[in-house]
Curated annotation (Swiss-Prot):
This is ADP-L-glycero-D-manno-heptose-6-epimerase. Homopentamer. Its cofactor is NADP(+). Binds 1 NADP(+) per subunit. It comes from Klebsiella pneumoniae. Catalyzes the interconversion between ADP-D-glycero-beta-D-manno-heptose and ADP-L-glycero-beta-D-manno-heptose via an epimerization at carbon 6 of the heptose. One of its GO terms (biological process) is ADP-L-glycero-beta-D-manno-heptose biosynthetic process. Pathway: Nucleotide-sugar biosynthesis; ADP-L-glycero-beta-D-manno-heptose biosynthesis; ADP-L-glycero-beta-D-manno-heptose from D-glycero-beta-D-manno-heptose 7-phosphate: step 4/4; Bacterial outer membrane biogenesis; LPS core biosynthesis. The gene is hldD. Disulfide bonds: none annotated. The active site is at Y140 (proton acceptor), K178 (proton acceptor).
Length: 310
């Protein structure tokens, strides 16, 4: 069996899909479906069982067995960069991850987990997986950073695989439940379909992000599991592009509309990453050599998925 925590969420459900595509269906999805809309991410997928996150954590802490586990993909976390309840964030992202890590280490189960580019904070260069480059801007980024630091202490002595992925700006299918935290491509598509002008913040051409397609993210997760490589790795494309190419690809797909530029919100000033670009040196050294989709390729594929029933 393979366990995917956060399996009804954005990246988790795409990992389930990637496993299904390889003929793997003996999957336990762990999630919190208090937001019931997330069920749609699993409707077209095949899994063996579902468990609530709280029930799962109780069983993990009690040391209960789940049968033979081939791997745990730990994608379950609070991923909101605007959540400032530090106790909630540390319980959900840090403590939960530690419990699961030690459960895996005791049983030599491969443990693949979600870190984040938010660990780098407001950098504008040198997004490198090393302590001197890490200074998160929000409590979400801090929770991810602290767990990475914890993993670094354990890695030299670990007898089983531990790998963390610092996801950059991931977009693609199955993110609709994320609301305001969904990608710009998702929001632009929704605005166009609602007959509205698609909107970007003023100065968006000055914000550059490493936009990585979720299908590529799932492929990297599976490659590392299959190859048993440990460590903490950036997971982006290595390219930084402004929001304009995202908008251009969206408009090109819809063959209509023009961008309306709106004022940048005060609440995000000083807490907004203006630039992200993954340094892929360590990822490539580890042996992952596949290309990543460009924004034009990824957004076009995503638009086709979003509008498949139109």
């Amino acid at each position: 069996m393979i366990i995917v925590t956060g399996g009804a969420g954005f990246i988790g459900s795409n990992i389930v899909k990637a496993l299904n595509d390889k003929g793997i269906t003996d999957i336990l999805v762990v999630d919190n479906l208090k937001d019931g809309t997330k069920f749609v991410n699993l409707v077209d997928l095949n899994i063996a069982d579902y468990m609530d996150k709280e029930d799962f954590l109780i069983q993990i802490m009690a040391g209960e067995e789940f049968g033979e586990i081939e791997a745990i993909f730990h994608e379950g976390a609070c991923s909101s960069t605007t959540e400032w309840d530090g106790k909630y964030m540390m319980d959900n992202n840090y403590q939960y991850s530690k419990e699961l890590l030690h459960y895996c280490l005791e049983r030599e189960i491969p443990f693949l987990y979600a870190s984040s580019a938010a660990t780098y904070g407001g950098r504008t260069s040198d997004f490198i997986e090393s302590r001197e480059y890490e200074q998160p801007l929000n409590v979400y980024g801090y929770s991810k950073f602290l767990f990475d630091e914890y993993v670094r202490q354990i890695l030299p002595e670990a007898n089983s695989q531990i790998v963390g992925f610092r996801y950059f700006n991931v977009y693609g299918p199955r993110e609709g439940h994320k609301g305001s935290m969904a990608s710009v491509a998702f929001h632009l598509n929704t605005q166009l379909n609602n007959g509205e002008s698609p909107k970007l913040f003023e100065g968006s051409d000055g914000f550059k992000r490493d936009f990585v397609y979720v299908g590529d993210v799932a492929d990297v997760n599976l490659w590392f599991w299959e190859n048993g490589v440990s460590g903490i790795f950036n997971l982006g494309t290595g390219r930084a592009e402004s929001f304009q190419p995202v908008a251009d690809a969206t408009l090109a797909y819809h063959k209509k509309g023009s961008i309306e530029y709106i004022p940048f919100p005060d609440k995000l000033k000083g807490r907004y990453q203006a630039f992200t670009q993954a340094d892929l040196t360590n990822l490539r050294k580890a042996g992952y050599d596949k290309p990543f989709k460009t924004v034009a390729e990824g957004v076009t594929e995503y638009m086709a998925w979003l509008n498949r029933d139109a």
